[in-house]
């Protein structure tokens, strides 16, 4: 059809002076000559960190700690452990994540010895309450209380400390090696007739897995190729800031086994980050360093010249971020990803699209526009693996989710990523909220990745590399969507509906 053409090339669409979000643009379908199963989503986080799936857990204190990092690695992605804590805690989280060879985040509840169990609700969905000195999984379990035994106790027997009536965990039948696989755990539970097993490494508790956990995980999609480092353990990333004290933090994180470091800043084009990039590359040449955040080619060029191995793109696009509103700076995420990726590709630097991901379609758009991976916060928050306890609000089971620019997070130290001075006023660039229970990432991420593969198939791209080539040679065409087109492309015209993604 000479004289006619569908849509625009990406170069033309993104040169019109508009700041586009993912919802503002739509790809036009291309030709299919392969099956969905033939689509490969293998990629790179940075120059030397390969991944099987393009998913990265954001370094936020309500998203990425040990269980999330282990689960993401088991899925073929990676988690970046936040640094809104002291050095020893962050290093401990990394060591713990690398030890969770069975990446099950148990529903089990943990309490301190002096605590009481007030009601059966204290057990949550678990059949046990476990007791440790810290009231957490580590370093060692002291005992446990089963829900059935507690329910049969008299009221006056319950009005004492848990320590007074808990059962001891000294019996070695409860303990198994930390690197045992799920099938062997199930066999041990069956053989020993126990309700749970304790995974132990060098005398410390690594995880607790109950029969209920095993049954739940057996229903999840089968895991593919995990992200494993040279040490044969899960690859785990770590976030740090750009202050002088972060050099000491980095030393401890490298010793703990961090496989990649992410310089965590809302505006990465600063003298502080340039100096930190050079320090990391000179001091730890074997360690990949990801710089950012950036949204322009000018910002990206400075970090590339300094030696970054990856770029994190996004400013104010996260659901809990108010940077664009408060500071009047930022960029629509679709435009930012395309522009920065165009430059980064010329230097062989992978791009991480950070923020603005609400569904599988957004992931497809981010990847096809040039990103190698997507970094997710709210998409993973509220999952079983995310830090924090579930609570009920208006009848819905939720978990807290907060921006690292919220005042609540900044009081714990995250103001460093906003180049804040602790002696001066703190201005919030984020909010605190809650997200609904999503279940385990081990279940919903595989389904999400299959949806992404279907999107790639419709575009005629069998891999990320293929998609990037089709975009840059102008084969793939795009259009901007009007408000009415966005409404039409969503669910509309129904009195009521039930939406199930899988």
Curated annotation (Swiss-Prot):
Matches recorded under InterPro entries: Aldolase_TIM, CBS_dom_sf, IMP_DH, IMP_DH/GMP_Rdtase_CS, IMP_DH_GMPRt
GO MF terms, alphabetically ordered: IMP dehydrogenase activity; metal ion binding; nucleotide binding
Keywords for this protein: Acetylation, CBS domain, Cytoplasm, GMP biosynthesis, Metal-binding, NAD, Oxidoreductase, Potassium, Purine biosynthesis
GO annotation (BP), single: GMP biosynthetic process
Gene3D superfamilies: Aldolase class I
NCBIfam families in UniProt: IMP_dehydrog
Protein's name in the database: Inosine-5'-monophosphate dehydrogenase 2
